[in-house]
Amino acid sequence: QADVDPAYNFAVQVKINGAYINYLLPVKYKFTDPVKGELYQPLVVIPSMLLKSEPALRIVINKDEKIKGDLTIQNKKNNIVATPHTNYFLSNNKPDPSVKFNIGSVVMTAKDQAITVGYEIKSDTASAFRFLAKDNNMDYYSSSELKEIKYDHIPYINYMVKPEVEFKKIDVKTYNKKIGYIVGAGDKVPESLEQMGYEVTLLTEKEMAKNGLDKFEAIITGVRTYNTNDWMSKYYNKLMKYVEDG
C-alpha cells in the first residue's frame, strides 16, 4: 500500500441539516522545525526494544559453514535487561544450542542506547532464523525492526519488519579472486562477493589515484557510478586502458 495505517484514529461526527456524518482523522505528531517551521508527521507507536540483524541475507558455499553476524538491540525506554533469542527451538521448547550469542544478556540504562551482540549459527541447521529479545523486567518478547522512509515532499513512512537472517545455499566455484569495486549509489554487491570468497578492494578516488589496476582480475562499477562520483571522468582513460590490456 502507498501509506501505512495510522497508529490511532480520532472519530469525528458532524451534524449537517439534521444528518450525521462520521469519519476518522489520523492522529499526528506536531512539532516545530527551526528551518521548516510547523510540521505534522504520522504518530509512530513502537515496542520498548528494537532489533536489527546484519547481515539479513547470507550466501552459504559450504553446508557446514558457521555463519557469524550481529544483532543490535536498541532500548526505547529506561532500564532494560534484555536476553537475545531466536525463534528456532527444539522439541522441548529450549533454544537450539547451535545458535550461540557472545553475550547472554545486556543491560541498557538509558533510552535509545544500543548494544550489538555477535552470534554464530551452523548453516545446516535451518534456512532462516528470526531474532527476538526478551525484556527480563517485564517478561516481554520483542521481534521488531523499524524501517524508515524519509523525504521532504511526503510524510515520513515508518513500518516494522521481522529481524531475520536468511541462508542462500549455492554451488559456486570462484576464479580470479582479486576484484576492484567502485561504489555507486549504494548496493551490497561487495559484501555478497566477499561471502562467495572473493577478495574485494573498494576503489575510492584516492585508491584510483595511487593504485595500478593490473593487480585486479576484474573491476566492477556499482549502480550509477558516474552519477554519484564526480571524479570518475578523470579516470575514464585509466579504466579503458585496463580493458584494452585485457
Predicted features, each with a name:
Residues 178-245:
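Helical hinge/lid and interdomain linker segments adjacent to catalytic or ligand-binding clefts
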Residues 1-26, 118-130:
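Eukaryote-biased detector of low-complexity, proline/serine/threonine-rich segments
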Residues 19-55, 139-171:
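Short beta-strand elements
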Residues 155-194:
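An acidic-aromatic substrate-binding cleft motif
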Residues 1, 87-124:
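Intrinsically disordered, low-complexity Pro/Gly/Ser/Thr-rich segments with frequent PxxP/GP/PP motifs
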Residues 60-66, 73-81, 124, 184:
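Short solvent-exposed strand-capping/beta-turn motif centered on an Asx-Ser/Thr pair
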Residues 74-96, 134-136:
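Short acidic, flexible loop segments centered on an aromatic residue
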Residues 110-156:
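Helix-enriched interaction subdomains in cytosolic or periplasmic regions
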